[in-house]
């Protein structure tokens, strides 16, 4: 019997790549998101699409899990690129931008897990949180995003700790730069300031990454597929870093490179 997989934020980037990879592999895939691109990916892959309006994709996940025929064995709560976004730090706490960052990157994941948890327990399923290297370090001008991403790792560990005895696994993947539409937008200020092409901008931000390049959405999707698969049955509470080696760089020594 095919497993049922719910992917939040499945319309673009990593989420869309996961849908394209998992549906042909025999999984029964449901994708949710806030944009009409979700329907396009569903038409392309044969997945079932549910479009939820802002502020989060949690309604879509709830809709999937309420269907009697949709008892997911896997929930991919994608908050790094598909169902999440970064904003500049607000001038004072609790502004709309800060709340938007927390809603899009943390609250949506909480709600998605809560909606699907009964089915995950019944099926001894697993949850994969698509986090970010912002879960492990702080980038500039991204206070709300960094805060939410750090908290996402805590949520993953709590799910793994509390529901492991009932057979539920929870893990997180932390990508670095990935060539997604959201990351493309983040390149625009650098492109405008320095007259760079999109490719050159990615080369610039990855110049100190050991592999010297960003990941493709497909590369991250392959790692996601493994963590959700039976081959990873003993892996729970883990954080897989998929950043080309960026997080191992000793920044103070870069001047000597």
From Swiss-Prot:
Keywords from the UniProt entry: Oxidoreductase
Binding residues annotated for substrate, in chain numbering: 132
Active site: 145 (proton acceptor)
Listed GO biological process terms: lipid metabolic process; monocarboxylic acid metabolic process
GO molecular function: oxidoreductase activity
Top-rank lineage group of the source organism: Bacteria
Keyword Oxidoreductase: yes
Binding site for NAD(+): 6-29
Signal peptide stretch: none
Region of interest called Disordered, as start-end residue ranges on this chain: 75-96
InterPro entries given in the database record: NAD(P)-bd_dom_sf, Sc_DH/Rdtase_CS, SDR, SDR_fam
Function comment: Might catalyze the conversion of monoamine compounds or their metabolites.
Family under the similarity heading: Belongs to the short-chain dehydrogenases/reductases (SDR) family.
The protein's name in its UniProt record: Protein MoaE
Source organism of the structure: Klebsiella aerogenes (Enterobacter aerogenes)
């Amino acid at each position: 019997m095919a497993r049922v997989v719910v992917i939040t934020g499945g319309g673009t980037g990593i989420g869309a790549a996961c849908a394209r990879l998992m549906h042909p592999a025999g999984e029964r895939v449901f994708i949710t998101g806030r944009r009409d691109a979700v329907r396009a990916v569903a038409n392309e892959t044969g997945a079932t699409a549910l479009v939820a309006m802002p502020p989060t994709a949690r309604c879509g996940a709830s809709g999937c899990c309420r269907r009697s025929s949709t008892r997911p064995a896997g929930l991919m709560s994608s908050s790094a690129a598909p169902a999440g976004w970064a904003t500049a730090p607000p001038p004072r706490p609790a502004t709309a931008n800060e709340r938007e960052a927390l809603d899009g990157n943390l609250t949506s994941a909480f709600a998605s897990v809560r909606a699907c948890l009964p089915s995950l327990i019944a099926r001894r399923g697993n949850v994969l949180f698509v986090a970010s290297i912002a879960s492990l370090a702080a980038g500039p001008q991204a206070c709300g995003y960094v805060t939410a991403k750090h908290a996402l790792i805590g949520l993953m560990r709590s799910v793994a700790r509390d529901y492991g005895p009932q057979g539920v696994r929870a893990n997180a993947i932390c990508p670095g730069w990935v060539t997604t539409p959201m990351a493309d937008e983040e390149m625009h200020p650098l492109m405008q300031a320095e007259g760079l092409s999109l490719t050159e901008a990615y080369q610039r931000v990855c110049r100190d990454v050991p592999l010297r390049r960003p990941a493709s959405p497909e590369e991250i999707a392959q790692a996601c597929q493994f963590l959700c698969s039976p081959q990873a049955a003993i892996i729970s509470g883990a954080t897989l870093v998929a950043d080309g080696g960026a997080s191992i760089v000793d920044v103070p020594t870069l001047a000597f490179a």
